[in-house]
Amino acid sequence: MTVTRVGLVMHGGRAQAGDAARIVRGWCAERGVHCADIDVWRDDTRHSAREEVAAAGNPDLIVTLGGDGTFLRGARLAAENDALVLGVDLGRVGFLTEVPAAAVCEALEAVQEDRITVESRMLLTLRASRRLQVPTGMEALLRYGRGPLLPPPRVRTDCAEGDDWGIALHVTALNDIVLEKLARDRQVSVGVYLAGRLLASYSADALLVATPTGSTAYSFAAGGPVVSPRAEALIFTPVAPHMAFNRSVVAAPDEPIALRVLDRSGPAAVSVDGQLRGVLDPGDWIGVYAAPRRLKAVRLGPMDFYGRLRERMNLTDAPAAVADGQAAPLWPVTSAPPADLAHLTLPPGPGDTPSAS
């Protein structure tokens, strides 16, 4: 593809990010490509994704310089603008970022020359019984991270609304949508519905709905399953539930998951990819489902998700297995697979080149 406008989202607390940003700006200047910093905390206020991408000139490529948290900020903007997102890895335990800082110029050249794989990632969105907002006076108490809160989500004007179906909100999540308790001494009580049917009522510290991409984030820390990012699923996981059934449930992509705050519960916070977006009172609900749009992530080649899982999670082998030495690939990659395996995803063989997907 031909890149004409680049948006930069960077981790301001890392010197490496500033160095990488100068390299990106220099690359853009040499090729006459418009480059704009997207400062999500300019003027000490947060802006909607639509305002941020408009201020940056509606970039067709967003480059994030940081770890997975920075990538999530960039993904929110890319989803709004249907842009590509390229993650430059300056973090420590990242699954989302793709390129080491030293290779950022080579990565930009690969994008410009269309020598990339475009990986389509599932996103979540939601409907709610009412507009989400943070009550006056509660923002300072609930402020997440170092900067101010995002503005309340806008109502989607392209979707029908009604008393039964609630209102559709301009929200996209690459990792997860979480409903969590506000009071330290009181769990949140929530009825959980899958595909419109009550699964169970929970008292828990939090309840979350994750994408396969988000299965290695908060959901993983809460005991949820690791799911291939190429899969299509919604993953429901309770966090510290006060009940015997504490398992995750993996739903099909067309099965929405609704969370209703019960009358005996206190208020509950709604966070989207770690960003506080509103507070629900007893009787309120949110319905989480697969978003119609997808994230378009730049990959320079096939992603070795399971190799990265082993590396980033520091997975170790059982003592009995260590004696066998370093594990080799199950199947050789020196020749083409036989016909009965040709439809499977296997390690790349000789001469394989990335293609858009």
From Swiss-Prot:
GO biological process: NAD metabolic process; NADP biosynthetic process
Catalytic reaction list: NAD(+) + ATP = ADP + NADP(+) + H(+)
Protein keywords: ATP-binding, Cytoplasm, Kinase, NAD, NADP, Nucleotide-binding, Transferase
Active site: 68 (proton acceptor)
One Pfam family from the record: NAD_kinase_C
Domain of life: Bacteria
Cited function: Involved in the regulation of the intracellular balance of NAD and NADP, and is a key enzyme in the biosynthesis of NADP. Catalyzes specifically the phosphorylation on 2'-hydroxyl of the adenosine moiety of NAD to yield NADP.
Cross-referenced PANTHER family: NAD KINASE
The name this protein goes by in its record: NAD kinase 1
Source organism (scientific name): Streptomyces avermitilis (strain ATCC 31267 / DSM 46492 / JCM 5070 / NBRC 14893 / NCIMB 12804 / NRRL 8165 / MA-4680)
Lineage, broadest ranks: Bacteria, Bacillati, Actinomycetota, Actinomycetes, Kitasatosporales
